[in-house]
């Protein structure tokens, strides 16, 4: 059975750790996180971990916008699915 956005809730989560080694880089990163309704879950003077939730195109776009930063590591869940309505998945 194929689950689609019409008959199921389909989401992914992405954690991305990257360097923010200047005030300008930090500001740019925070604007990208905010634009994609992400959340900063860890912040040090030189690095940041951002979390994004959403459908695959949104996650791909957020990661693409962060590509110009020095990315240390990423963790991505893949699709998590639950059928809409009363029917079990």
Give, region by region, the residue ranges found by the protein language model:
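Long, contiguous binding/interaction regions
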Residues: 1-89
